[in-house]
């Protein structure tokens, strides 16, 4: 089979299709796998291509957190929540730059997505709820292993049962279009090795119905992210897996997809100085330190931010200080993630002290000032006051029970809220806000849902919501005829 391609292959050469399927999915993280499961369930033949040697992308190395209003645990604990409250939290964190129709779909379908993962795929959650910065209530679930590996295993196992092949080490180089601008396939380099950028051969795969782009973000693509924000150079590390680069996004932009919010790049304020990427240190800071402790500038001994603020506000406060800051908590607060604490103590990511004065000395913090800071903070908690940063301390954790714990924090690039524009059907749109026929996208490769910044535990949930939408609509060839 041959087809005259426009604007992608040089000199409009007639090409030979090496293979064909109904739906091509690029990326094997939670967004891509959710899309593939739905497309196959709808009767389409599906092939998933993954550029790395292992499946899962950032999902695999995530902490397995999923935010959803009205989830089962909230009902059991009589926590009042709603899609509307979630929606408002999303807009606030996103500085109201969110594409509201997309944020609304996400907020309204989040609980269903989390339920689908458990009921249909067997993913289990811990018997705990967390309230991370920017969320109005505790609505964040975590997988039983405290890892996204549970999700990857469940989804890839289901795809195997369904007869869907995931081909690793296959790099997307081009999205192929016909003379009418309809996406009709992909160009893939097989045998791709991320370490040396090598590949064996190039293949053209025809998609008889649609292509779904689920290639994730570009947090580890330093040259590309510096084009968007020159401040995020090599001195700012990333929590992402090595394959979090911009090839998929670039391929879509090349055929006319509209870029949305590319310069808004999220940094995680819980970045642990004493580890590479996102490990037990960052996890401990996220799940225990920020919810139950304080963040102090070591040069002054004073707090610098509302520890429950969204990620952008906390990161900006640390960047403003100009050096790593110190997170401090007591034994009771640290107990909220005892599993991570044990790992962090063994690996030197968290330090333990019997006295607050010893902590101050070790972390080079003015001891008297730190003592005053902690005393003032505890007094406001006892009185149920709101502090100078707007943090309501009625339910905050006292810092009074030894031993005390400290860790050094500096933001790391964690998430890229910007990407290709999509509509509520997960169709990729062009600069005229019109769908590019036969091209869908889901997950971090998309922009607009989160606006300027994303709330914690929202990435996986959002990937499931729009991955499922993309898969169902792609299989039906919705909007592509």
Language model segments and positions:
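Extreme N-terminal leader/targeting segments of oxidoreductases
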Residues: 1-23, 41, 449, 453, ...
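Conserved N-terminal/central alpha/beta ligand/cofactor-binding core
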Residues: 3-6, 10-13, 45, 51-165, ...
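C-terminal structured subdomain/cap of oxidoreductase catalytic cores
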Residues: 17-18, 204, 337, 342-344, ...
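N-terminal Rossmann-like FAD-binding beta1-loop-alpha1 element of flavoenzymes
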Residues: 23-48
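Hydrophobic, small-residue-rich alpha-helical packing segments that form membrane-like cores
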Residues: 148-157, 173-202, 210, 219
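A glycine-rich dinucleotide-binding beta-alpha-beta segment and adjacent secondary-structure elements
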Residues: 174, 369-453
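Glycine-rich loop(s) and the adjacent beta-strand/alpha-helix scaffold that form part
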Residues: 193-194, 198-202, 206-274, 466-469, ...
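An anion/pyrophosphate-binding glycine-rich loop and adjacent beta-alpha core
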Residues: 249-369
């Amino acid at each position: 089979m041959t087809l005259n391609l426009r604007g992608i292959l040089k000199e409009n050469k007639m090409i030979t299709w090496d293979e064909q399927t109904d739906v091509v999915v690029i990326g094997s993280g939670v967004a891509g796998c959710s899309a593939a499961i739905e497309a196959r369930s709808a009767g389409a033949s599906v092939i998933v291509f993954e550029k790395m040697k292992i499946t899962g992308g950032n999902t695999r190395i995530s902490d397995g957190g999923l935010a959803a209003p009205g989830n089962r645990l909230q009902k059991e604990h009589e926590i009042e929540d709603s899609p509307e409250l979630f929606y408002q939290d999303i807009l606030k964190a996103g500085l109201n730059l969110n594409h509201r129709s997309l944020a609304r779909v996400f907020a309204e379908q989040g609980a269903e997505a989390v339920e689908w993962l458990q009921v249909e795929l067997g993913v289990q959650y811990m018997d705990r709820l967390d309230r991370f910065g920017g969320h109005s209530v505790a609505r964040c679930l975590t997988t039983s292993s405290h890892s996204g590996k549970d999700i990857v295993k469940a989804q890839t196992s289901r795809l195997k049962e369904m007869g869907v092949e995931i081909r690793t080490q296959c790099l997307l180089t081009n999205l192929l279009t016909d003379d009418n601008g309809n996406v009709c396939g992909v160009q893939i380099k097989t045998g791709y090795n991320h370490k040396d950028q090598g590949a064996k051969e190039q293949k053209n795969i025809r998609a008889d119905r649609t292509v779904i782009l689920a290639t994730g973000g570009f947090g580890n693509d330093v040259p590309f992210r510096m084009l968007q924000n020159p401040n995020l150079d090599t001195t700012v590390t990333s929590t992402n897996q090595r394959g979090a680069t911009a090839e998929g996004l670039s391929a879509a932009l090349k055929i006319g997809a509209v870029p949305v919010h590319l310069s808004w790049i999220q940094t995680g304020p819980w970045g642990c100085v004493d580890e590479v990427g996102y490990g037990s240190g960052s996890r401990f800071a996220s799940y225990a330190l920020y919810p139950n402790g304080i963040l102090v500038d070591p040069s002054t001994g004073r707090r610098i931010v509302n520890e429950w603020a969204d990620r952008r506000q906390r990161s900006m406060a640390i960047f403003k200080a100009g050096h790593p800051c110190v997170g401090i908590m007591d034994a009771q607060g640290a107990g909220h993630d005892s599993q991570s604490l044990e790992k962090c103590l063994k690996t030197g990511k968290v330090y333990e002290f019997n006295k607050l004065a010893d902590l101050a000395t070790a972390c080079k913090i003015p001891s008297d000032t730190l003592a005053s800071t902690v005393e003032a903070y505890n007094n406001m908690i006892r009185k149920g006051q709101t502090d100078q940063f707007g943090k309501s301390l009625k339910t905050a954790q006292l810092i009074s029970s030894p031993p005390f714990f400290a860790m050094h924090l500096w933001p790391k690039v964690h998430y890229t809220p910007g990407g290709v524009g999509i509509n509520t059907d997960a169709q990729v749109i062009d600069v005229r806000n019109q769908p590019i026929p036969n091209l869908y996208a889901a997950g971090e490769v998309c922009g607009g849902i989160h606006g300027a910044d994303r709330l914690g535990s929202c990435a996986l949930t959002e990937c499931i919501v729009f991955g499922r939408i993309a898969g169902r609509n792609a299989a039906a060839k919705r909007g592509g005829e």
